[in-house]
């Protein structure tokens, strides 16, 4: 009986490990993120190969609601280099996100507020599944960005002074 419990333990550790494949640093600069959520993503085989090779760009991506589903738009996943052009995917195709109905309704109600949008923050491997982190945020104005940069530089100076 002890042998089986060890096997279960090792499998749960694998599921908790994740490998970052792509990150959208620009979104963290452009938006004040108020809420994040993890979602699955519906991909083709060649898209999975490209993402595992780090060929995904989340910078211009955003999410939209259609027919009770949430779609990821304008995310560029480069075609896989070792596959012929006939079998490759469209780099900018719309991709369906896999969320529970309650989560979709909650996200939709959050984005109906003025200025709120859903942006992809990161793509990562969780076990053998590719997951995406979405952020609900409001666009920052220029003066907000300047204040953030000032605060960041002040924190940097304080940390460097404390290290001395």
Curated annotation (Swiss-Prot):
Subcellular location: Cytoplasm
Top-level taxon of the source organism: Bacteria
Listed GO MF terms: RNA binding
Pfam families: SmpB
TM stretches of this protein: none
HAMAP family the UniProt entry points to: SmpB
Alphabetical list of NCBIfam families matching this protein: PRK05422.1, smpB
Function noted in UniProt: Required for rescue of stalled ribosomes mediated by trans-translation. Binds to transfer-messenger RNA (tmRNA), required for stable association of tmRNA with ribosomes. tmRNA and SmpB together mimic tRNA shape, replacing the anticodon stem-loop with SmpB. tmRNA is encoded by the ssrA gene; the 2 termini fold to resemble tRNA(Ala) and it encodes a 'tag peptide', a short internal open reading frame. During trans-translation Ala-aminoacylated tmRNA acts like a tRNA, entering the A-site of stalled ribosomes, displacing the stalled mRNA.
This protein's name: SsrA-binding protein
Organism: Prochlorococcus marinus (strain MIT 9301)
Annotated gene: smpB
């Amino acid at each position: 009986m002890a042998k089986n419990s060890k096997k279960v333990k090792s499998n749960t550790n694998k599921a908790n490990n994740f490998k970052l494949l792509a990150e959208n640093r620009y979104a963290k600069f452009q938006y004040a993120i108020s809420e994040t959520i993890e979602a699955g993503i519906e991909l083709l085989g060649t898209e999975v190969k490209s993402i595992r090779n780090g060929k995904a760009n989340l910078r211009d991506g955003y999410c939209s609601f259609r027919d009770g589903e949430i779609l990821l738009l304008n995310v560029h996943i480069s075609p896989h280099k070792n596959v012929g052009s006939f079998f490759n995917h469209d780099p900018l195709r719309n991709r369906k996100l896999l969320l529970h109905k309650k989560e979709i309704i909650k996200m939709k109600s959050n984005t109906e507020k003025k200025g709120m949008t859903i942006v992809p923050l990161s793509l990562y491997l969780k076990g053998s599944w590719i997951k995406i982190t979405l952020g609900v945020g409001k666009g920052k104005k220029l003066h907000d960005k300047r204040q953030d940069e000032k605060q960041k530089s002040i924190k940097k100076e304080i940390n460097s002074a404390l290290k001395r």
